Amino acid sequence: MTEQSQPGKPASSEPATPSEPATPTEPREMTEARQAMVEKQLLPRGIADPRVIQAMKTTPRHLFLPAEAWPIAYGDHPLAIAAGQTISQPFIVAMMSELLSPLPEDAKVLEIGTGCGYQTAVLVALGYQVHSIERIAELSRGAQKTLGELDSLPAELLVGDGMLGNPPGAPYDAIISTACARKVLPAWIDQVREGGLIITPVKRFGGRQYLMRYTKQGRRLSKDDLGLVRFVPLLRGVE
């Protein structure tokens, strides 16, 4: 659930094979728009993992949006969804997914902020055991419906406070947050395994947000700063 952002990465030379329709009834223009998204937005910015490219080519972003938004569903920008939230810019979804590339395909991943379910669907397409938590029940219900129709339901879809993580499913190989925290939450550190990853935007002094990848080393976290981003804030509680 992000606003537009442009962290820099070297361009990929990976050619994009033609996209296939995500569903038997998918309009051709949606298939073509998704192919163009990969070729014009992802590859030039350095998205190179073949698994991520394939997941982005086969996950129908437009189905996570109302029909009136379909003509702009594959644009290089976030879009508004229900409850005052947004569906992330495609590049950000691809980038955050690619940051998980060191993990094995069956890794257990906790997603903080299901939103409409688009990032969730990409993670499922990558083969991860996805546990996803959303604080807004309306969004969780909508995501469950769409993901179910696409046969992309995660291992667990929960309504709850993402700041608390999901202790019953721990330990996780990675935790990925689609909302901006002021710091890495202690619950997340507790629930990720030794050597596991935490990928989250973090707000620093001055209000700027940075996408960070942390690796757990005991009670310490090593960190990689991946550049400026803009995400919706991580909030406490359940609605």
PLM segments and residue spans:
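Polar/charged low-complexity regions in secreted precursors and cytosolic/nuclear IDRs
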Residues: 14-15, 20
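Conserved nucleotide-cofactor-binding alpha/beta core module
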Residues: 99-222
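Class I SAM-dependent transferase core
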Residues: 2-9, 21-110, 121-122, 126, ...
